[in-house]
Amino acid sequence: MAARQAVGSGAQETCGLDRILEALKLLLSPGGSGSSSLQVTKHDVLLATLKSNLSALEDKFLKDPQWKNLKLLRDEIADKAEWPQNSVDVTWSFTSQTLLLLLCLKETMIRLAANFNPGKPNPRTPEVAPALSPDALSISQQKTVQFVLQFVVTLGICPYLMPGVGVPLRYRTEFGAVVQDVVCFDAAPDATRRLYTSCKALLNVAQHTSLGSLIFCHHFGDIAAGLCQLGFCPTKRKLLTPAEEVLTEEERTLSRGALRDMLDQVYQPLAVRELLILQGGPPQSCTDVKTQMRCRAPAWLRRLCGQLLSERLMRPNGVQAVVRGILEGAGAGAAGGSDAEVTAADWKKCDLIAKILASCPQQSLSPENYYRDICPQVLDLFHFQDKLTARQFQRVATTTFITLSRERPHLAAKYLLQPVLAPLHRCLNTAELSESDMVPGTILVTEEELSRCIEDVFKVYVVGNEPLTVLMDSLLPVLGVLFLLYCFTKQSVSHIRSLCQEILLWILGKLERKKAIASLKGFAGLDKAVPSLHSLCQFRVATQGGIMITIKEAISDEDEDEALYQKVSSEQGRVEHLGDLLSHCQECGLAGDFFIFCLKELTHVASENETELKTEPFSSKSLLELEQHQTLLVEGQERKLLVLQLMAVLCERMSEQIFTNVTQVVDFVAATLQRACASLAHQAESTVESQTLSMSMGLVAVMLGGAVQLKSSDFAVLKQLLPLLEKVSNTYPDPVIQELAVDLRITISTHGAFATEAVSMAAQSTLNRKDLEGKIEEQQQTSHERPTDVAHSHLEQQQSHETAPQTGLQSNAPIIPQGVNEPSTTTSQKSGSVTTEQLQEVLLSAYDPQIPTRAAALRTLSHWIEQREAKALEMQEKLLKIFLENLEHEDTFVYLSAIQGVALLSDVYPEKILPDLLAQYDSSKDKHTPETRMKVGEVLMRIVRALGDMVSKYREPLIHTFLRGVRDPDGAHRASSLANLGELCQRLDFLLGSVVHEVTACLIAVAKTDGEVQVRRAAIHVVVLLLRGLSQKATEVLSAVLKDLYHLLKHVVCLEPDDVAKLHAQLALEELDDIMKNFLFPPQKLEKKIMVLP
């Protein structure tokens, strides 16, 4: 025996990998053609082939001396093996010999690796790869091993699995069905012993790293199924089989341990996926009859897989393993593939995972412990950077967040919401800062923490879009900090600005209206009880472009003025940013409700002023009381100023659609009536107040006159105005308003059945005012700005608390001279109807410092030019001078009006005005500012469009000016010149022929060499306009340069770094493709000429 062991040891030293792999190939096929010949055999032919392969291998061992060492190694391993190797069943004999050769391969690879001693690398040739370990398998050798493993699993494991355990062999391949029929289950050894032997031998082979990766990557599921059956399948106690054919309890225990060791060893998502397959998963619809006939997994296996999956889940990083295990099979993560985008859209699968994660397994000691371990891993799913998996992981995390918040709100608040919102809670004015944190300059919240916090809140609240109570209540305390952060991001560029805005808009839209109004009061500073940023904390721009929260530096005496200025400007900016935020909340009605709240606050301000006048004399107060009184007075004045500032901003930012329902309009009118009554009580009635009151009552008249379809519920709301209207009718000094108030009371009380003439006249007067201003409102919209409306004007004029906002039912005329207003409201004037006095008044208004007056005057002059008014056209030089001077104005409404005027004037006298404009556009920066040149460029573009076919007359000066502008050092001017060049070329058609080469050379040079992105975009856009404008004529007009343009577009698509320029180039290529298709394959006209013979 000792001699045999010595020989065996020598065999291990001399036996090589090539010999073992050659033996394995011999077992696969006698012709060496791999497994292809076996896959086409049937039953008897397969058995004969297996016998032939076994005989050929034994002949090699007996007759070929070169195989002697391998034979000795195989015999040594066979002696150590504890399983029966010979059987009447050929399939088992084949499997047994294959397993022995795999064990020989493993032992040889271990021996070769142990004896390998690589030399030291040569420092002179560091680029040379290190020596390869002798136990490494080549690609072809790995394929051979994979074929062998497939046969071992197919013949040694799959046939012996119980129904419902694993995927049946006959449903995998046609060859698998053949194998299932040729296995002899009656021959020794028993099927259970065969399964145990195969699994144990394969796990032994898998101890080598290289071989283990080949086994587990492809056959983990089958081995796991076998170990589950061996270790956990209930045994029948009634009929005991012979001892050699029954697994002992020790072997079952070893099988259970091997299963758990294998699950811990492999890639965890792979383990999760295979366990789900073993468990059976949800029933799937399938038209395949074979698939429908598959047995369901037995109950013990389903329970076992559920237990093992729960163990995988509760391990470190178990959540990620479960998510990857379920999703990767469909294209996410490491698996990737063409189905990744399909999987990203499959939200149902992500939601199913979320339900699994939110359900506490039975193995957990308590839900508290489970969620304490799971929730941090769920939060980590939000922070994956891989674009392919990020969407799915975030969907799973968001849905888990929502599900847990719905089912276990107290645990969600403790383990999910508190960690997410912790950076914001840390800097609240209600939080207690430690002494170490109060050192000036200390970073309380880092840039990464704050960015991650805002992104997580956005994903949970806005993306999840579930207004659960626990979610709303958790976010309410930090809304003040969130709003201040939003205000800070508005001061500079920040990637979290849009996230903060979306979060605030979402929460304000989902909150109850009272809570939303309370939050807005806190944002504006009207409610000090709302939690906000700690007085010692401040936002600062971080080094990576984000935002961090730090402790303020101590303010010295010299910096007190600067600190006060910063405080005042920040408060003013906060109110303006609140107005911007509310401008997005008009459709839901929140902006209207907050506006009405501010109106009511104005009434309180008036009443507070009255009480202040009746205060006790200072002589009756102590010094402490006097100081407290002065503090309260200062706070009260600050609140009043804040309310006035809020009203001014809201009037400026809100559109006429601020009120979305009848209730809001009635509340607005009620607030106006209350304020009027309060003013009467204080004897402070004014003309502006009378106009405001008249307009608000006109609103009610419009609604009662049929502008709004009123229901019985609306009349119930309108009845709230009856006491106020009665008070106005009894106390207001103006008899017209008194009469209107009485008539409105009658109409409301009778539900509109009786309406006096005064009500109808008031409604018509209000609607006429709206029509009067309709044209100017359109001009305001085109300038993309909202100039201060009449409510703001009233507020500034009286400086006392009056306002009348625009609503969806009325709007007020701007304050401009009558001479300006009259011509603009007449659209059908005849030539000569404008008098000299009117013209002079409008010309004077064109120099008025008030922006609305000046803009209206410019629009009026433009209208007269468009109508060819003789008086206006006689002063063309004067008008041109006025328009050109106003081009340099900074207000959008003014200079856009001036641009329109110059364009209309040039349309009338192009030969006189166009040369001056071209000279001004072509001038240097010293003569005109870049902004003015850009505005002149806009004028030239409008002139080119207006001239149409007549533009050919001025082709030479226009095209030369634009080509020179492309060489200007200012990038914005170059882009403007290219835009104008595109408009011009689009309209020249065949007249472009003589300069087509110059234009093409210019575009190619700019698109390839210009350093500014906007200029390159403009050049490519010119090509798009050129092809789009010429359409089918492009093959004739651009015949000489079409190839150059095609090469340019391909160059941009392939090499241009800017995505917008690439998009323009792609659009141009599509235009060119359509042009050429229509040129080469013109559409067939299915028509036939019918000639009538004389």
UniProtKB/Swiss-Prot annotation:
<keyword id="KW-0472">Membrane</keyword>
<dbReference type="GO" id="GO:0016020">
    <property type="term" value="C:membrane"/>
</dbReference>
<feature type="repeat" description="HEAT 2">
    <location>
        <begin position="952"/>
        <end position="988"/>
    </location>
</feature>
<feature type="compositionally biased region" description="Polar residues">
    <location>
        <begin position="796"/>
        <end position="813"/>
    </location>
</feature>
<comment type="similarity">
    <text>Belongs to the Tango6 family.</text>
</comment>
<dbReference type="InterPro" id="IPR019451">
    <property type="entry name" value="Rtp1_C1"/>
</dbReference>
<protein>
    <recommendedName>
        <fullName>Transport and Golgi organization protein 6 homolog</fullName>
    </recommendedName>
</protein>
<keyword id="KW-0812">Transmembrane</keyword>
<dbReference type="InterPro" id="IPR019414">
    <property type="entry name" value="Rtp1_C2"/>
</dbReference>
<feature type="modified residue" description="Phosphoserine">
    <location>
        <position position="556"/>
    </location>
</feature>
<feature type="compositionally biased region" description="Basic and acidic residues">
    <location>
        <begin position="777"/>
        <end position="795"/>
    </location>
</feature>
<dbReference type="GO" id="GO:0009306">
    <property type="term" value="P:protein secretion"/>
</dbReference>
<feature type="compositionally biased region" description="Polar residues">
    <location>
        <begin position="821"/>
        <end position="834"/>
    </location>
</feature>
<keyword id="KW-1133">Transmembrane helix</keyword>
<feature type="region of interest" description="Disordered">
    <location>
        <begin position="777"/>
        <end position="834"/>
    </location>
</feature>
<keyword id="KW-0597">Phosphoprotein</keyword>
<dbReference type="InterPro" id="IPR016024">
    <property type="entry name" value="ARM-type_fold"/>
</dbReference>
<dbReference type="Pfam" id="PF25267">
    <property type="entry name" value="TANGO6_N"/>
</dbReference>
<dbReference type="Pfam" id="PF10363">
    <property type="entry name" value="RTP1_C1"/>
</dbReference>
<dbReference type="InterPro" id="IPR039600">
    <property type="entry name" value="TANGO6/Rtp1"/>
</dbReference>
<keyword id="KW-0677">Repeat</keyword>
<feature type="repeat" description="HEAT 1">
    <location>
        <begin position="873"/>
        <end position="909"/>
    </location>
</feature>
<feature type="transmembrane region" description="Helical">
    <location>
        <begin position="468"/>
        <end position="488"/>
    </location>
</feature>
<dbReference type="Pfam" id="PF23565">
    <property type="entry name" value="ARM_TANGO6"/>
</dbReference>
<dbReference type="Pfam" id="PF10304">
    <property type="entry name" value="RTP1_C2"/>
</dbReference>
<dbReference type="InterPro" id="IPR011989">
    <property type="entry name" value="ARM-like"/>
</dbReference>
